[in-house]
C-alpha cells in the first residue's frame, strides 16, 4: 500500500511543530554519537526557530501517514549563501525517498529566498547522505566553518 508523504513548513507560532522539530533535532544529534556543543546546539534548541526563521531561513517537517518522519533546515550564512542543516529521516522511514523529497523542497525554498549557493558540512560516517548530495550536484569545497570531526566534508551547490 502506498504511503502518504506530506511536508509542512514550520512557522514561528506553530508551537506543536516546533516541539516536533526539537524532537527530531535531538534524535539527529543522538544518532551522530558526537557532542554538537561546537555548534551551540543546546541554545539552538531553546531558541527555535531562531536562525531558521523566515525570511532568511526555513524549517520543514516530513510526515508519513501523519507520523513524524523527518526534517530539514536552512539558514543564511552570508550574502547570497545559505547553509543546509539537520537533514534527518527517522530509521523506520528510510528507503521511502523522504531525504530526497526534503532536499528538493529546501533547495527550491533557497532559490525563492534569492540565494545563489547552498553549503553544508557532513560527517565521514554519513555516506548515504553524501551520495544524495552528490546526486543533487553538490561538490567539495574548502572548509567554511569550524567542525572538529576529522574527515568532515564541506560541500556546496550552485543554485
UniProtKB/Swiss-Prot annotation:
It is an enzyme of class 2 (transferase). CoA binds at residues 87-89, 95, 131-133. Gene3D superfamilies: 3.40.630.30. The keyword Transferase applies. Its EC number is 2.3.1.-. Keywords: Acyltransferase, Transferase. Residues 5-159 form the N-acetyltransferase domain. InterPro entries: Acetyltransferase_Enz, Acyl_CoA_acyltransferase, GNAT_dom. GO terms for molecular function: acyltransferase activity, transferring groups other than amino-acyl groups. It holds the Pfam family Acetyltransf_1. Catalyzes the transfer of an acetyl group from acetyl coenzyme A (AcCoA) to an acceptor substrate and releases both CoA and the acetylated product. It prefers L-threonine, L-serine and L-methionine. It can also use O-acetyl-L-serine, L-tryptophan, L-isoleucine, L-valine, L-homoserine, 7-aminocephalosporanic acid, thiamine pyrophosphate and thiamine. This is Acetyltransferase CD1211. It comes from Clostridioides difficile (strain 630).
Amino acid at each position: 500500500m502506498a504511503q502518504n508523504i506530506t511536508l509542512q513548513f514550520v512557522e514561528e507560532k506553530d508551537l506543536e511543530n516546533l516541539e516536533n522539530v526539537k524532537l527530531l533535532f535531538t534524535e539527529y544529534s543522538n544518532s551522530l554519537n558526537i557532542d554538537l556543543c561546537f555548534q551551540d546546539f543546546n541554545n539552538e534548541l531553546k531558541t527555535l526557530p531562531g536562525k531558521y526563521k523566515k525570511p532568511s531561513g526555513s524549517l520543514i517537517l516530513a510526515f508519513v501517514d501523519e507520523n513524524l518522519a523527518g526534517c530539514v533546515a536552512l539558514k543564511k550564512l552570508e550574502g547570497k549563501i545559505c547553509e543546509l542543516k539537520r537533514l534527518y529521516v527517522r530509521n523506520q522511514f528510510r528507503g521511502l525517498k523522504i531525504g530526497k523529497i526534503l532536499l528538493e523542497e529546501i533547495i527550491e525554498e533557497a532559490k525563492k529566498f534569492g540565494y545563489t549557493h547552498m553549503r553544508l558540512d557532513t560527517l565521514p560516517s554519513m555516506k548515504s547522505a553524501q551520495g544524495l548530495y552528490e546526486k543533487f550536484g553538490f561538490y567539495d569545497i574548502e572548509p567554511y566553518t569550524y567542525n572538529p570531526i576529522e574527515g568532515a566534508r564541506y560541500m556546496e551547490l550552485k543554485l
